Amino acid sequence: MAKDNQQIATDDMQQTIYKELGYKSYPFPFTTPAYLEAYGTLVGLKPPTAKTARVLELGATYGGNIISQAVHNPEATFVGIELSQDQVEKGNKIISDAKLDNVSLLQGDILNFDESLGNFDYIIAHGFYSWISDEMKDKLLDIISHHLADNGIAYVSYNTYPGWHTMEEVRQLMLFANRGYDELTHKEKVLRGKTVGSLVGAQILNYDNLKERNSKFLGALRSVIQKDDYYVGHDHLEPHNDPCYFYQFNDHLKAHNLSYVCDADLTLSMVRTYDDSIADKLEKLAPNSQADQEQYLDFMLDTTFRKSIICKESAAKDISYDVANPDKVNTVPVRSIVNSFVFQILFDEEALKMFENELVRDTFQALIKDGGTFNMIEALAILKAAHDTANASEDDLEPAVCSLYKAIVEHMVRGGIRFYKTFPDKQEYMEGLSYVPARFTNFVKAIADGGSEYIYGANMFNDAVGDISEEDLLFMELLNKPKAKSTMIKKIKDSLFSADKAQTGKHQNAMAEAFYNELTKRMEQLGFIRRKKNDGLS
């Protein structure tokens, strides 16, 4: 399938913007198989097991989103398709340097998609749909329709109206500011766009009536000016940026025998988590359509971006949004779903006052003190122990259990609690038993040796980690097998502190021990720690 000259010119400009503005490929936590598996499970689907999934990313750039996933998920397989030969070559060099054999980048145009690649459990297209032609949009959904496993999950993100109407004003201002300046590089055009935008915004702020009338525009303008140059060049100066309404995207899915599941931001999907008045009105406006309710919600929230989770039409019959209804959270089907997850609390103890039920509050406090990761068996055991310690009435127990389920679901939706069916591997450091496997060390070394120009490091949740350092790499290389604390401290002192003659041996030991304590905790947080059976300390 051949492209027209306009699309070829658009592709060329995109690649020029990438090169001139120093684009880096981000990891995104909401695109991982474990994340998508959990969200599909939440609404009643039975997605493929994340641990051994086969994953395709379309528009993979340098591979920054899937290389990190491959490091943390060695039993899964990842394939990225990218138009730019330069980005594919650089990404594959990072993969080679990291010695990874479960991820690859392929140069190709999705219009000429290689059908021999077969089917995938999960298909990802982040930051792609809004920046391609209608023909390519059709092809993207055609690939998902024909290459997604029957119970598979896909993810597509895109800019949305109505919120992007205001952003479109900012985009048009920046395009107008650069009209007639074809000789400028894209970096210079971004600078000119930001400068002109600042001048226009400053003039509006000089007049109270204009400031009030243009408050939304000023907010959007301020947001864009503060963004990285790459984002501004990509979203506001590329020739193609095509937002749509959510209902239009949903209609496009239906045309390809695909169905919408929910958004990766559950607050856009679980309308019952808003107050009853909003939920009741949305249900009256669209009593039999989840998608229409979400479209009305987009009008209310002025939504600018969506991260849609998708399945095949044939699987959609199992979808239920009962988990979002507080009146149904404590039914057997919903409790069964909630019981299948492992959770991580993201709020701290200062937020506990939001829980009215004292037993629920005590339960969350105990869970946070224990590290914040738990399952429902553990949470219910803690709740029961708190109930018994308080000598509370037996009649108080079941209401507290109901309140606990409601609280957990509410914060799953609002983002205060992460949840997974396949929880990313995170282990505590144990002296003499724990070590850093070579795959993590090789990954960090590949980043340190030049890969950081193109991709970020990431933890086990695929959150970007931008501060990976030579000290991290040194520690990882030292902890290549289980070692005694004393051995590690001596090696750290010899490597980092022994040359400092201004410090006594005692001070050097203290600094080495502090470094050891800090780095073992950091390795835990990054998900780089694994444990071997105790074969003796070395």
Residue ranges and their predicted role:
Residues 20, 24-52:
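Conserved alpha-helix/loop element of class I SAM-dependent methyltransferases that forms part
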Residues 62-75:
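Conserved SAM-binding loop of SAM-dependent methyltransferases across substrates and taxa
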Residues 84:
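Conserved SAM/SAH-binding beta-strand->alpha-helix loop
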Residues 99-110:
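Conserved SAM-binding strand-loop segment of SAM-dependent methyltransferases
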Residues 115-123:
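A short acidic, Gly/Pro-enriched loop at the edge of an enzyme's catalytic core
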Residues 138-150:
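A short glycine-rich, Lys/Arg-flanked "PGG" loop and its adjoining helix->strand segment in the class I
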Residues 156-183, 203:
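Conserved class I S-adenosyl-L-methionine
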Residues 271-286, 290-306, 310, 349-538:
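Long, charge-rich, low-complexity alpha-helical segments
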